[in-house]
Amino acid sequence: MSKPFKLNSAFKPSGDQPDAIRRLEEGLEDGLAHQTLLGVTGSGKTFTIANVIADLQRPTMVLAPNKTLAAQLYGEMKEFFPENAVEYFVSYYDYYQPEAYVPSSDTFIEKDASVNEHIEQMRLSATKALLERRDVVVVASVSAIYGLGDPDLYLKMMLHLTVGMLIDQRAILRRLAELQYTRNDQAFQRGTFRVRGEVIDIFPAESDDIALRVELFDEEVERLSLFDPLTGQVESTVPRYTIYPKTHYVTPRERILQAMEEIKDELADRRKVLLANNKLLEEQRLSQRTQFDLEMMNELGYCSGIENYSRFLSGRGPGEPPPTLFDYLPADGLLVVDESHVTIPQIGGMYRGDRARKETLVEYGFRLPSAMDNRPLKFEEFEALAPQTIYVSATPGNYELEKSGDEVVDQVVRPTGLLDPIIEVRPVATQVDDLLSEIRQRAAINERVLVTTLTKRMAEDLTEYLEEHGERVRYLHSDIDTVERMEIIRDLRLGEFDVLVGINLLREGLDMPEVSLVAILDADKEGFLRSERSLIQTIGRAARNVNGKAILYGDKITPSMAKAIGETERRREKQQKYNEEHGITPQGLNKKVVDILALGQNIAKTKAKGKGKGRSTAKAGIVELDMTPKALQQKIHELEGQMMQHAQNLEFEEAAQIRDQLHQLRELFIAAS
């Protein structure tokens, strides 16, 4: 099933890229464990890494610091490798509240979560690709260091079907139930199956557009065919097919029974400790909760919060690292840590926060001590598991530089000839009015502006002020979910609005060639948001435009500002020299705007169900303003049918959306008649 990596690009490496590719490949072939690619904004770091992957033909994991950047990298890698398996692995929670206990107020907070089904499907697809083929690039967030099902148990649970195989229908249905698939003869959706006579239709959990039909003749598999679950159209017949579990956390029955005995033993030991310390309430609470979980596991094979017993289910000893996505990556895999100056500290911080919360739960009898082994990797465990690693950043941190030693590969020259932005420092007193006049100049020539503030309050007030003065502005904040965040960035590039205001979200890696001005308010306030690295990264957002400019508002030049300005000037001079030597005229990037995640219908659904925090409007079914009365009438009739269908299916939000659109269409129809 694997194919060789085949790089699809209209460009050949140029500038500093060929030398960077050669040095990275030589380092990997010589067995170097750590290398750093120091590449400035817009120098084509992703293209360099794609060339290294294609030349070395090794399965690769790319770690990104957040979902937004992971989505952008996923889109770019998919364009570079359209014929290979490019996968996306990030946290599938749209909302997550872990269970916690607050002793001071005696408050227990139950676990509450909302799972994004589409991202869950993409996670399953990623692990399937890693198990089945070698031409894989998995773009992951820090979610990759969190516990995942044991790959050995996961492989044991797979159901292999081949044409001519002898197996009765009830055995297939029983195996599907073990894989946590549910029978649903009415609504056929991901992770379900339906039975019609001797035909079983299965919708694989890792697929979003293809299902499997198993046709039996008595106790023999007569035919296996792949079909479109929406239309029922048969795409092809296959000689064999492997059905993967619906979740990464499935466990064989015998392992569950064994784990239950181990849980009972630990419960007995823990009860003795609590009683010896006169903690009667905690002992009673722990016994009741654990016995309930054991009963559920015995009857159903799983329970709510089963991840807290993961140590027993995967057969690990106390303190051993949990199985993670790294266990699915082949031994000769390659790890690329993008924006490493942010990603590496993130990995280091995950374990401690999780540990503090779990210790309280254990101490007060909500969980057994083994629950503390359901955790992300410690930093030293990550280091031990990580294969050969390339750190990628425009501003590498001390850790990467220390690990790489002399193996820092510079990529400062941009093939496009683009220079780093011109930097100006202006006084704080008039920053808002000055910014408004700058925005108007840029909007007049169809260019975009990014504004970064220090606080959420300042960002909200500034957005309101700019709106009052007639500017098309949006505010990007932490409450906006992943998909909508990508939509906002896409809308900025398309010119739906001119100004994007943010706090810490407009930094690493965001690729927006239309942005010609970056304004940094209160740049002279020293702190992590105005450190040398933060300033260089933020200034870099304007480095993809020919007219790139950065304005730092401050009454004094801090050491961080001086270093950031000095480094930007150094890079600008080096690029200028390269351009003069090679006769290059700087050219803007004409990068096409695409739906990075290509989530299809899910984007529309997410926007419809969104909380309206992003000031976005859902655009269901685009309507041309110059439609003829006849075409409008036809469209109205079509949408009325859709609205009634949604109402019958109890999908009232979608029906209401179409109702609002019908109201606008009828007004257009009256005006046109």
Curated annotation (Swiss-Prot):
GO terms for cellular component: cytoplasm; excinuclease repair complex. GO terms for biological process: nucleotide-excision repair; SOS response. A motif (Beta-hairpin) lies at residues 92-115. InterPro entries: Helicase/UvrB_N (IPR006935), Helicase_ATP-bd (IPR014001), Helicase_C-like (IPR001650), P-loop_NTPase (IPR027417), UVR_dom (IPR001943), UVR_dom_sf (IPR036876), UvrB (IPR004807), UvrB_inter (IPR041471). Residues 633-668 form the UVR domain. The UvrABC repair system catalyzes the recognition and processing of DNA lesions. A damage recognition complex composed of 2 UvrA and 2 UvrB subunits scans DNA for abnormalities. Upon binding of the UvrA(2)B(2) complex to a putative damaged site, the DNA wraps around one UvrB monomer. DNA wrap is dependent on ATP binding by UvrB and probably causes local melting of the DNA helix, facilitating insertion of UvrB beta-hairpin between the DNA strands. Then UvrB probes one DNA strand for the presence of a lesion. This is UvrABC system protein B. It comes from Salmonella heidelberg (strain SL476).
